[in-house]
Amino acid sequence: MSESQKKVIVGMSGGVDSSVSAYLLLQQGYKVEGLFMKNWEEDDGEEYCTAAADLADAQAVCDKLGIELHTVNFAAEYWDNVFELFLEEYKAGRTPNPDILCNKEIKFKAFLEFAAEDLGADYIATGHYVRRADVDGKSQLLRGLDGNKDQSYFLYTLSHEQIAQSLFPVGELEKPQVRKIAEELDLITAKKKDSTGICFIGERKFRDFLGRYLPAQPGKILTVDGEEIGTHQGLMYHTLGQRKGLGIGGTKEGSEDPWYVVDKDVENNILIVAQGHDHPRLMSVGLIAQQLHWVDREPLQGTLRCTVKTRYRQTDIPCTVTALDEDRIEVRFDEPVAAVTPGQSAVFYLGEVCLGGGIIEQRLPLQS
């Protein structure tokens, strides 16, 4: 079967990137259909970008492009495989990244299986800003062409088999080009702002939302010198490097420099803060990562020189990675790095290629 006869199911989110992805695939001659995923049941009535509005936008785009739109409900899978783990991590005092888990369990597992088995798809496609390259019979994950929008950080858990079944049409474009195409086609999503917030749950007041599922446990805020200067409403609401929302100003005798979260003592429910965004207690010389996943290669043995990101949109950090065992590695940065956060992902690169990554188990502090 020629590529042009192959069937692609595009994950239609109701946003501009998936809208333009569907159009580009039609232009390339594929047989294109859309799929809208509903992954969250509860509606709190807030006037945020609701699933109903997104579905209406996705339907309007599909109507305009002349393609069929299917819908599917993955709420049970989302709850069991993403949200419960998300809550467990917060309960343990870590800061998880639900988007990474969501891509792993929903968009490139539940969606991929449903598209292939129920809809007869040869490929799925999404509006992610990444590229793929097929090298020696394996599909590699590459950064998106638009450095500002590159989303490979969120897709490091994909296998080369999953990437081989996936197409990323906007990964070859820059965001302004994508918006321009949508405007020229007069798509309803052309000027729609990019979604933020928790994957599939949307833009909510995070503290209120989390408080519904996890009871808040107020505790002390201590300085690095052990001085008590305030009360926090729950460690889960705070992450390393955080400045806003601490509710503390300068101390009477001290400077007026802003306070930053530098550590969390989960056992004693204490939030530890220091003044200055580059305080030594906030800096790390490396990290230990676990739950490793390598996209298209065997588990690391020995050492590797590469770059790493410990959060999205961070500048690449040159580092040396050493295998501790099959599922744990030690990463040493060339220069100290601020706000390395347990629970987040460390993602590794060689040039344009995303090698894989793991969950940050602990940071190796510059100063303890």
From Swiss-Prot:
Spell out the residue ranges making up region: Interaction with target base in tRNA.
97-99
Q: Could you identify this protein by its name?
A: tRNA-specific 2-thiouridylase MnmA
Gene3D superfamilies assigned to the protein according to its UniProt record, in alphabetical order: Adenine nucleotide alpha hydrolases-like domains (2.30.30.280), HUPs (3.40.50.620), Translation factors (2.40.30.10)
Q: Name one GO cellular component term.
A: cytoplasm
Which cysteines does the record link by disulfide bonds?
A: 102-199
Which portions of the sequence form the region Interaction with tRNA? 149-151, 311-312
Main subcellular localization, coarse class? cytoplasm
Q: Which domain of life is it from?
A: Bacteria
Q: How does it assemble?
A: Interacts with TusE.
Q: What class of enzyme is it?
A: transferase
Family of this protein = Belongs to the MnmA/TRMU family.
One Gene Ontology term of the molecular function aspect: tRNA-uridine 2-sulfurtransferase activity
* The enzyme's E.C. designation: 2.8.1.13
Location(s) in or outside the cell: Cytoplasm
Marked site, Interaction with tRNA, at 128, 344
Q: Does the keyword S-adenosyl-L-methionine apply?
A: no
Write down the NCBIfam families for this protein, in alphabetical order.
PRK00143.1 (NF001138), trmU (TIGR00420)
Which residues are involved in binding ATP?
11-18, 37, 127
Question: What's its catalytic activity?
Answer: S-sulfanyl-L-cysteinyl-[protein] + uridine(34) in tRNA + AH2 + ATP = 2-thiouridine(34) in tRNA + L-cysteinyl-[protein] + A + AMP + diphosphate + H(+)
Keywords attached to this Swiss-Prot or TrEMBL record, sorted alphabetically, are: ATP-binding, Cytoplasm, Disulfide bond, Nucleotide-binding, RNA-binding, Transferase, tRNA processing, tRNA-binding
Main function: Catalyzes the 2-thiolation of uridine at the wobble position (U34) of tRNA(Lys), tRNA(Glu) and tRNA(Gln), leading to the formation of s(2)U34, the first step of tRNA-mnm(5)s(2)U34 synthesis. Sulfur is provided by IscS, via a sulfur-relay system. Binds ATP and its substrate tRNAs.
Query: Which is a Pfam family this sequence falls into?
Result: tRNA_Me_trans_C
Would the keyword Iron be found if you checked this record's keyword annotation?
no
The gene designation is mnmA
Q: From which source organism is this entry? A: Klebsiella pneumoniae (strain 342)
Q: Quote the catalytic residue positions.
A: 102, 199
Kindly list the biological process annotations in GO that this record carries: tRNA wobble position uridine thiolation
